[in-house]
């Protein structure tokens, strides 16, 4: 989509990063800026891994969004607050209660450790470890708070957030670039996730991140539509990473954005959220949210193909 692509290019500017925009009701990639980085083997997901961990804990019935989790002798926190403020201790506690096998099982269910795209040339895999990292490095707790030991790609994160945005369908992402390919586009379902009842438990925290939490910098540039998202900030071997994954919840449909930054300062999650706000602003100013092609309503019917890789 030329409107989305130009909006992303203008917002990213000279930052070393990539932007992936996805139509969550089909898995169609609307724009992919800096394809080399977008299709690379990925990076530590930082705090965006908390989305997967939260869904795992909700699926296992360990928590609801209001369940207080003890983080000390006198301090308790619920999921909504923990997501909004990206509280590491909360997700470390969840990870240890779940254990590595369940954490890994759900991460794979949501698409980590496997190709997110369908016949996208040059796409690399990312990596999810076969066992927990050593306790001296933080064990499963650090895997669940910072994504320590995990390598996630922007496409994998885009596919997972698209499944959250659409109610539980994990699509293969596809990137049609020719007009005839766009006209003949057919969504391909990877699998159905049993998360529809859990999404309301998750969405308050994702909305809170933008309204008052770690992603509130987005609202410096855009406040016309509801945005739900999750930031991530960390560093690995001297390289800083900044992530922000989100979706716009509009009256005519939804669109997913993943912003990934890599390098030195100011590379961190709130900066990625600020850039996402500029992208949404640019799209809004070009009437994308009024009648944008490629933004079908949630009730639209699309033909899909179930595909086995």
Language-model regions, residue ranges each:
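A short acidic/small-residue loop/turn micro-motif
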Residues: 35-39
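Low-complexity, flexible helical/coil segments
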Residues: 55-59, 118-121, 128-131, 281-283, ...
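Short, gly/Ser/Thr-rich active-site loops of penicillin-recognizing serine hydrolases
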Residues: 273-309
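Beta-lactam-recognizing serine transpeptidase/beta-lactamase-like catalytic domain environment
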Residues: 2-3, 7, 16-31, 41, ...
